[in-house]
Each structure stands twice: as C-alpha cells, then as structure tokens.
Amino acid sequence: MKLLRYIFIALALPVCTEAGAQTLADFIATGLENNYNLKIARNEEAISANNATYANAGYLPTVNATAGYSGTVDTGSGQLGHGVQGGVNAEWTVFDGFKIQATYAKLQELKRQGATRTRLDIEDYVATLTAEYYNLIQQKIRMRNLNNAVKLSKERLRIVLERYSIGSASRLDLQQAQVDFNADSAKSLKQHELMATSRIRLYELMAVKDMQTPLVLNDSAIDVDATLTHDSLLEATMRLNAGLLDKRHNIRLAELDYKATMSRDYPYIKLNAGYNYQHTIEGNGRGGVDFGVKVGYNIFDGKRTSQKRNAQLNIENADLARMQLEQSLRSDLADLWQAYKNNLRLLSLERENLVTAQENHYIAHERYMLGSLSGIEMREAQQSLLDAEERILEAQYNTKLCEISLRQISGDIMKYME
C-alpha cells in the first residue's frame, strides 16, 4: 500500500517549469505576428477592404480633361492657321437598374469574406502550431523516459560487472547487459534528433530565423480537456465554422450577381456636363458649357435570358456547396468525437497500466538487487515500464490532437490564446 500511495503521489505532483519559459499563448502570439503566410493573408484582406469603395461601385461621376493643338496650311495662299483647344467633361450614371447598389454590396461582401478567409488561415495556423507545441512536449517526455531507461541499464551493467568480477555472474549476463545498455543509448541519441526536428518545425512556424534561439516551454506535460460535449460542439460548428461562413458569403455573392444581371431589365439614366474652349492664332476665342440627360433602355442583347438562368444556377450551386460542407463537417465531427472519447477511455486504462508497470518494476528491481531475479527478467520488467510510459504518452498526445481538431472545427481554436 505504501508503494502504491507513493506512485499515485508521484503521478499527481506538478512538474516545475523553468524561469523565463514561454506559454503556448506566447508562441501563438509570436507566430501570428511573424508568420509569412498570415502576412500574405492579411494583405489580401486589405486589398478586399481597399476595393470596397463607392468609386469602385460606380456611385461617383467620371470627369475627363482634354487639351489639344491643331493647325492647317492653305495650299493656295500658304498661310498657316492654328489654335488650341481644351475642355472638361463629366458623366454621372444616376440610375442603372440597381446595378451600382448591387456592385457596392458585392464589394462589401467580398470585404467580409476576406476577413473570414484570413480567420480561416489563422485558425489553421493556430491548430498546426498548437499540435507541434504539444508534439515537442511529447518528444521531451519521451526523451526523459529514455534517459531514465539508459540510467537503469547503466546501473544494471555496473551491477553485472561487479558480479562478474567476483564470479557470481556469467559472461553471457555481462554481454546481454552491455547490449541492452547500448540499445537504450542508441534510442536516446535518435530521440535527440526527433526532438530537434520538432523544435526546428516550431521555429519555422513562428518565422524565427535564428534556429539557435533558446526555446523553453512553460508546459512539461500534455494536459487533456475531458469536458467537451458533442451537442455544444455540433451547435458551434454549424454556427461558427469559418469554412461554412465562407460558403455563406459565396451564396450572398451569387445573389448579388443575380441582382446585377436583373438590372438590365430596367432603364438607365445618365447626366453629362462639360465646358470646352477654343483659341485661334488670330486671337479669336470661344467657349461654352454643354449639359444633358440621357435615358436609355436595352431592348435586346441576345444573352439576357441565359445570363439570368446561369445566375440562378450559381445561387443554387453555392447553396449546394454549403449543404455539402455542412454534411462533411457533421461527418468529420462524428469521427473526431468517436476518436476523442475512445482515446479518453484508452488514456484512463493506460494510467492504470502505468501504475501496475511501475509497481512491477519496483518489485523486480528489489528482487534483482537481492540476486533472486535474472538479468533477462529484470530487462523484461524495465521494458514493460518503458512500453507503458510510451503507450500513455501516445494516448495523451492523440487525445490532445482530437481536442485541437474539435476546437478548430467548432470555431473555438483561439481558446489556446487564453
């Protein structure tokens, strides 16, 4: 009972973090500021915002200024006549069947869609960085487990050497202990490489140019949120998923395109005004103001009917794409939820297995020190402990990946910024 109580206390104790360590939120904030893909996405969003103006929609008049010089030669008298001309003309479309209003509304919708797509890129980025952050934690924990295995193998090799020197252990025992120590050392070296790869990947995601910059994580364990519920996730997904919001923007854009097409069924009204001036070499000058109103109606252009039908089909297709994505999201959520719940159950089971493996290893070590357990049996107990540690680590990380994906699909991924 004392041993079990000690094991449970050891599992429950928090691990102290280093001074100056950075949290996940710190890493995300750095990445959001530096990542090149996100900078491009923000620039594209800014372009959409810049385009959403009254001028681009056609609300404002067009003004043109002209100037010229002309000359003539009388072939009979040889006299040269020349002069200069200049003028300013303006034209303003007052009404064109609501096409201007539809165009402006479309530009505003494109602006909102640009913001949604930037959010989509940000959420993808946060999910990727969060997964890599916890992957590095996973690699660090695995490194710690392998280092412990190396220490145990080294201690066993020391004991066998002492026993071999006094004749109480065979050369076979010594060779096997050496092989096991070398194998554990090789795994530890390989794990250093995997840990460095994960660290470099984090540097890349955060656009950190100096790969030697110290990288100290505030977290040393993979904490899993077991409080998620399916109904709340489904409701949030249908309401907040960025990809689904983008499809709804597409429906609105298709509706505005249809409205612009329908504008051809209405007359148009245009106002124009101008001032023109002409001056000749003889000193004569004249100028004047002209203005007018033009009303017109497009009786037939040969394409109006098909364009209306195509615009209606585009609305239908946009709505079908939305429904298709909704169905896909429901399916993805169901798969992720099943994996999430299964991994939670697996995690609970592996916690029990780890306690058993730790107790078994403790007993085996005591018996080995007393000489009542062979080196092979001691190695089996050590390997069982390492396997149990690896299984619970994989269960923790896989559960965390499911949690990250569930938060992303439901539009709640930015919670990791808190």
Regions found by a protein language model. Give the residues of each.
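Acidic, low-complexity, intrinsically disordered peripheral segments
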Residues: 26, 391-418
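Bacterial N-terminal signal peptides
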Residues: 7-15
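Small/polar, glycine/serine/threonine/aspartate-rich low-complexity segments that form flexible
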Residues: 66-96, 102-103, 216-227, 259, ...
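Periplasmic alpha-helical coiled-coil/stalk elements that build and connect Gram-negative outer-membrane
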Residues: 26, 124-236, 336-339, 343, ...
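A short glycine-centered flexible hinge/capping loop motif at secondary-structure junctions
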Residues: 164-168, 368-372, 409
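Bacterial Sec-pathway N-terminal export signals of envelope proteins
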Residues: 19-64, 209-252, 326, 337, ...
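Sec/SRP-type N-terminal targeting helices
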Residues: 39-43, 56-60, 94-122, 147, ...
